[in-house]
């Protein structure tokens, strides 16, 4: 092995297998772009984003870690959300949950 070398398995990486997902139509009703990161609790995003928030409770974007989705003003797009893993305790963001889901 060479220092710093990666030894990766063959095949694709499967993320979020077996977790609940939901697809939602999201519209940016604001006058500024809004960007949402991969692990942001989607339920607590900027309120200029209009979508079914109850379906987004306990969910985040189903995109690779470190990625984000940008919503331009007036833009509507469908996103796929995936449930948070672990013990389902959420703190921070807009402090709308601050505890167990």
From Swiss-Prot:
UniProt key word Nucleus? no
Keyword Ligase belongs to the record: no
Cellular compartments per GO CC: urease complex
Its keywords, alphabetically, are:
Cytoplasm, Hydrolase
Q: Which compartments does it reside in?
A: Cytoplasm
Q: In which pathway does it act?
A: Nitrogen metabolism; urea degradation; CO(2) and NH(3) from urea (urease route): step 1/1
Catalytically driven reaction(s):
urea + 2 H2O + H(+) = hydrogencarbonate + 2 NH4(+)
Self-association and partners = Heterotrimer of UreA (gamma), UreB (beta) and UreC (alpha) subunits. Three heterotrimers associate to form the active enzyme.
- The name this protein goes by in its record: Urease subunit beta
Q: Which organism is it from?
A: Actinobacillus pleuropneumoniae serotype 5b (strain L20)
């Amino acid at each position: 092995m060479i220092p710093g070398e990666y030894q990766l398995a063959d095949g694709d990486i499967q993320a979020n297998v077996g977790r609940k997902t939901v697809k939602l139509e999201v519209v940016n009703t604001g006058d500024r772009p809004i960007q949402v990161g991969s692990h942001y609790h989607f339920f607590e995003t900027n309120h200029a984003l209009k979508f079914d928030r109850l379906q987004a409770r306990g969910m985040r974007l189903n995109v690779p870690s470190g990625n984000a989705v940008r919503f331009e003003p007036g833009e509507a797009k469908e996103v796929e959300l995936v449930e948070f893993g672990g013990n389902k305790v959420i703190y921070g963001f807009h402090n709308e949950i601050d505890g167990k889901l």
